[in-house]
Amino acid sequence: MSEVIKSVPPGSQNTSQWIISKDQLVFTPSALDGIPLDQEEIQRSKGCNFIINVGLRLKLPQTALATANIYFHRFYLRFSLKNYHYYEVAATCIFLATKVEDSVRKLRDIVINCAKVAQKNSNVLVDEQTKEYWRWRDVILYTEEVLLEALCFDFTVEHPYPYVLSFIKKFVADDKNVTKVAWTYINDSTRSIACLLYSPKTIAAAAFQFALEKNEINLSTTTDGLPVWMEESQVSYEDVKGVLTLIDSLYKKINPSKQALPIDQKNGSHASSVAPGTPSSLASVSTQATPQHQNSSGRTDSFHSLNTETPSKSTVDDQILSTAAQPKKSSDTDKEMETEAS
């Protein structure tokens, strides 16, 4: 059993018990199966993209989407990507998260939407009369047992959102633009392994710092040039910098050709051109998403923001989720999963 698996005690109700060190990343089950760390991160991100796209079709609240993503990352602390395809685990995480977060959806609806997203075709027929329906249904019910084991029946998830709202209220008087950018940044962070390396409070602090500089807001600093608000909030400067660097790295791996998009101050959405958004005092970070509210539904062109309704075939998510937009037979989908997992 790997060092990482040992580091997560059964039944832990403490978020910190799910946090590992960077050194332990080389001992994940996937790494021990020969999957390079950068490829593991990309496959994790693909699974999170799948969660978001299916979740938006189901009109799930934001907390349910975030919880599903965290379950997904925790699952692969105990099991390998080589043995469990990220689409299948992602679908199961959605199913469990909807129950835990009191956002229950019918298994039938989850199955149908998972099949449609996996095949990249909203019009494909999936119902109880198709093999694809029963294949996905069986996969979700089977994998749920494995997921429960992986989580040690510890369903409690602490999110960064309350922390960032506290920072915003205390230090910038509930500035709406800061809130939008910080909220979106946290959403994007769920696609990375940040939740495995840093506490929710640290992730929230990174989102707040990024939002401050994105909106050109300068708060007071110490004689050493460090933000006073971090000191008052008892947040580590180095850890915040680590989160920013990690998210930046993920953006570059997923879509190296694109950088941060500027916020359109008129409507709060991102423009289509490239613009810098680097927190100069900390690290270079790219972000590409639109701030959202908890009960919105939709999707943007790269990372998840909940402000549109239907997926676009020209998006980065589309490139990640599938290699074809035509309907596939069940056997074709199985073959695609086997190819992606290898």
Curated annotation (Swiss-Prot):
Modified residues (Phosphoserine): 302
SMART domains linked: CYCLIN
Pfam families: Cyclin_C, Cyclin_N
Signal peptide interval: none
Annotated positions of the Phosphothreonine modification: 300
Example of a GO biological process term: signaling
GO CC aspect terms: cyclin-dependent protein kinase holoenzyme complex; cyclin/CDK positive transcription elongation factor complex; cytosol; nucleus; P-TEFb complex
Swiss-Prot/TrEMBL keywords: Cell cycle, Cell division, Cyclin, Nucleus, Phosphoprotein
Family as reported in the entry's similarity comment: Belongs to the cyclin family. Cyclin C subfamily.
Protein purpose: Essential for progression through the whole cell cycle.
Subunit annotation: Interacts with cdc2 protein kinase and with the N-terminal domain of cdk9.
Name the record gives this protein: Cyclin pch1
Organism (species): Schizosaccharomyces pombe (strain 972 / ATCC 24843) (Fission yeast)
Gene that encodes the chain: pch1
